[in-house]
Amino acid sequence: MFLQIAACFTVIGLLYGLVSNLQQNRRLAASLPPGPPGHWLFGNVPPKNFPFIRFAELTEIYGPVFTLRFGRRIVCVVGRHQAAVDILVKHSAETTDRPRAIAASEMLSQGFRILMTPAGERLKKYRRAFHTCLQPSAAATYKPIQYNHAKNYILDCLHDGKCHLEHGRRYAASVVMYIGYGKTTPTSYSDPEVQEVNKCLGRLSEVIKPGAYLVDTYPILKHIPGYASHLWRYGREELALYTRQANAVRKQLEKDEAQPSFAAYLIENQERLGLSNDELAYLSGAIFGAGSDTTAAAIAVMTMAAACYPETQARVQAQLDEVVGSDRAPTFEDEEMLPEVTAFVLEVYRWRPVSAGGVPHRSTKDIVWNGYVIPKGTEIIGNLWAIGRDPELFPDAEEFRPQRWLNENGRIRDDLKYPVFGFGRRVCVGQHVADQSLFINTALALWAFKISQDPAKPIDVLAFTDTANIRPLPFTLRFEPRVKDIEAVLEAHLD
Ligand code: HEM
């Protein structure tokens, strides 16, 4: 008898939940931006592949902001520049938060990973710590090391152009290992330490894919013993790895042998910054996670664009020849005089944005936009792929056309922006370091080489990995030296 009554109450409870859920959905739907219809209970089906491309198609149909529903989760996708500014920049204070990511953040990262840290005290202290080491004046101090590694990239491409993607990855890994841990020697992707970090990042990349784990739709699963227990194990392994790396710097500091680095700064200021050992370990590791593959992918896109758009490449080279010539190599000091290089980089960012789908934000208050209400708790995706294809700002968006970034005087336009580094208070903390990397590698690569395709292996400009941060699938390039004795000229500069 008792069991029957309990069952009755459970069924009534479930029905009540269902009905109130439906009523809530109907109420919300009336004020939300429009979107494709979905199942009355489960909502829309997340795209299986390349969600940013599917979302860009939906932007064409439903407009600058459209709504999707996944179970109880409401997602607004922003696909036009002005709407992104209105919602994610002007309302930055209310959109700093991240959506709850149970599998990727709470289980795999034990809540420590900055990328998924919700708005609040932990995020504030994380970003404060980064700001000190990555703001423009601090970023400028990394220029010499970036230059040295960029020079290695050029020499690697000269001697072994087949492995150009690996050389770009080596550049990026070397720079972030220097900033993160003070490692001064070049870092190879085959280093066991880097391989271990990459194993962890590869796992994250799988777990973070929309719809990868049911627990993100049904949070109760987190508490079911045995459910996705490998995620907890992976999380423990990752924390142990970052702790080992931070402890190595701690030991160097004790022996007075440490190079200046982000980890050293965190350790020396741990108490003042209010960081636990685990937070400190994860934060030091974040530089590699966030800055390595992204930078390498952008460098790869730069070479891809140069090979596929030879006339555009030649335009940059004409300016390099005029300003720099061939007796010396370009340096950071030439930047002001090389707007064609900067325009090329800006177009690389727009044409194939590395963080193509953007990193989701979450509203912590109702936001009124264009007569619609984006309610508190909505996930907001700034779809960078679609924003870079905004026809009002970027006509013929599929064309790689750096000239769109230049004004009639050949200077960089200050009225055109593209948010490749994200939005508002969540904007990428490494943007200045990344800009420096892209500038110097582009300037040196286009000064040193005529980069072209192998006619026998034409490049597919849409062949990219289907991952949270996209990167080109392997492609073949030819590096034809434009400067006599590149090696000697580069060495002379360093002497
Ligand atoms: C071309 C290279 C890069 C691109 C395209 C890029 C892009 C991005 C984007 C789109 C975000 C998310 C912003 C948002 O939520 O709106 C982000 C976050 C982040 N980036 Fe970068 N990034 C690059 C390089 C770097 C580098 C070199 C570092 C470190 C030295 C770095 C560190 C971070 C960190 C720590 C975050 C998380 C910030 C947070 O969640 O509060 N990134 N980046």
Swiss-Prot record:
CDD domains: CYP64-like. It is found in: Membrane. Heme binds at C428. Its EC number is 1.-.-.-. Pathway: Secondary metabolite biosynthesis. It holds the Pfam family p450. SUPFAM superfamilies: Cytochrome P450 (SSF48264). Its cofactor is heme. It is a single-pass membrane protein. One of its GO terms (molecular function) is iron ion binding. Belongs to the cytochrome P450 family. This is Cytochrome P450 monooxygenase 113. The lineage of its organism: Eukaryota, Fungi, Dikarya, Basidiomycota, Agaricomycotina.
